[in-house]
């Protein structure tokens, strides 16, 4: 695979107008035309659009996904292969991106699973105040697309409808740049690095549940379930070869924007001290100790086959799936592969509880990306957009509702879109203590 040129077009303002076009930082949006595009899927009844800006006292509800618009202008395939079009290799050629903005998709979908590890939940986003400080999405100019779906859809049908609608609209937005000169171009070509450099890999533990569709992670539109480790080229993430579920939007499960901007992958792509040997997707969340040991052993063997001297190891999800991650750290270290583990921690409401649920002594280089469990107090909003006028702050049947614009008390950061920095993409400073 050859290199990928990533051309940047900065969006400083979004305006609803008569046509969809981009010029000198202004993105004009034809809401009626984009609504018709989203509704080409018969499972989508209608779509509407709003704009929210950084610092505005606006709250977005019912968020199912966040996407940075991108389009391929050279090379094989198109962005989001296997979802928008046929499966074709991506990660080379040229891709345009609209930076400084995102398409935020909100949907009032109530799935059949309302509690437990497979609960189907949406997220919220505050564009100001303490909630905004927890998420990168509050600093973006956001185009909010609210979808109405046909009644009676299964979780997988709803996911397909949401994803196809949002990716189609995101692609249309990015297509406004195809004939324009970019503000900047970044080239990602890990294969051009010298063979004499140390070889590094990124291992991402991806949490999935057996027999549960949509899976939390899909590769070229194919759900990753019950699999052992898969090697992918780092540039494939840039072009949307990895996509998430839109049904379970809690912050420890990354959404599309997170995969497009995976910070450990981007860091190694830009670091000329290493040869980036590949990204390993390690399926985690197995149910027995034996299965967990096999998954970790397999990930270590794959890293060895790539000639890895070093590994950045991180994860998605929560719960006992962390056992596979820690066993992978242990296995890599035992085979001479130097590791750094990047993970959020639990810590309890005051940060004094055990931060991780499982340890191995080989994990002697760990970066914390913050405490998931802190209580969040959100002030009242002047404006509410998105799918819900009322919110269930605790995701179980019978939980009380509150007005979406009222002051809110959240028991953790989970329900804030981007509220948990699972991979260390923020500019927070960690100190040892």
Indicate residue ranges for each PLM-predicted region:
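Small-residue-enriched flexible segments
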Residues: 190-286, 397-433
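Gly/Ser/Thr-rich loops at beta-strand to alpha-helix junctions
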Residues: 208, 314-324, 345-348
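Long, compositionally biased, glycine/small-hydrophobic-enriched stretches that function as flexible linkers
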Residues: 1-223, 403, 407-408, 425-433
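Extended, charge-rich low-complexity interaction segments
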Residues: 366-400
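A general structural motif
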Residues: 287-300
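A short helix->loop->beta-strand "cap" motif at the edges of active sites that frequently abuts
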Residues: 334-342
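Proline-aspartate-enriched helix->loop->beta-strand connector
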Residues: 307-312
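Glycine-rich, charge-decorated loop segments at or immediately adjacent to ligand/cofactor-binding or catalytic sites
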Residues: 346-364
């Amino acid at each position: 695979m050859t290199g990928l040129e990533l051309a940047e077009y900065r969006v400083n303002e979004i305006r609803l107008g008569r046509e969809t076009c981009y010029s000198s930082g202004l993105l004009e949006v034809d809401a009626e035309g984009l609504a018709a595009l989203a509704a080409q899927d018969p499972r989508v009844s209608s779509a509407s659009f709003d704009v929210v800006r950084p610092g505005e006292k606006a709250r977005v509800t019912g968020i199912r996904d966040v996407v940075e618009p991108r389009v391929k202008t050279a090379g094989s395939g198109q962005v989001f292969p296997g979802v928008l079009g046929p499966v074709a290799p991506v990660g080379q050629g040229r891709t345009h991106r609209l930076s400084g903005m995102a398409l935020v998709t909100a949907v009032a979908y109530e799935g059949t699973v309302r509690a437990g590890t497979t609960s189907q939940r949406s997220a919220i986003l505050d564009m100001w105040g303490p909630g905004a400080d927890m998420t990168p999405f509050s600093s973006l100019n956001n185009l909010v697309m609210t979808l109405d779906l046909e009644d009676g859809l299964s979780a997988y049908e709803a996911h397909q409808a949401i994803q196809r609608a949002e990716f189609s609209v995101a692609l249309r937005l990015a297509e406004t740049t195809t004939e324009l000169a970019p503000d900047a171009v970044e080239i990602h070509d890990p294969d051009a690095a010298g063979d004499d450099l140390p070889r590094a890999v990124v291992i991402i533990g991806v949490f999935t549940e057996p027999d549960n569709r949509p899976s939390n992670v899909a590769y070229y539109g194919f759900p990753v379930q019950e699999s052992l480790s898969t090697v992918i080229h780092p540039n494939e993430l840039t072009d949307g070869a990895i996509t998430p579920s839109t049904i379970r939007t809690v912050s420890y499960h990354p959404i599309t924007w997170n995969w497009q901007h995976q910070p450990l992958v981007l860091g190694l792509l830009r670091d000329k001290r290493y040869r980036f040997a590949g990204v390993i997707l390690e399926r985690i969340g197995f149910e027995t100790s034996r299965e967990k040991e096999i998954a970790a052993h397999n990930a270590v063997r794959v890293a060895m086959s790539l000639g890895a001297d070093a590994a950045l190891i991180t994860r998605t999800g929560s719960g006992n799936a962390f056992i596979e991650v820690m066993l992978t750290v242990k296995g890599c270290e035992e085979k001479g592969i130097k590791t750094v583990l990047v993970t959020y921690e639990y810590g309890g409401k005051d940060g004094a509880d055990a931060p991780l649920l499982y340890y191995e002594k080989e994990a002697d280089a760990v970066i914390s990306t913050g405490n998931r469990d802190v209580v969040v107090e959100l002030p009242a909003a002047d404006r509410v957009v998105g799918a819900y006028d009322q919110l269930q702050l605790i995701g179980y049947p019978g939980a009380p509702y509150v007005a979406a614009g009222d002051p809110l008390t959240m028991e953790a950061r989970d329900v804030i879109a981007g509220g948990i920095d699972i991979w260390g993409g923020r500019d927070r400073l960690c100190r040892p203590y």
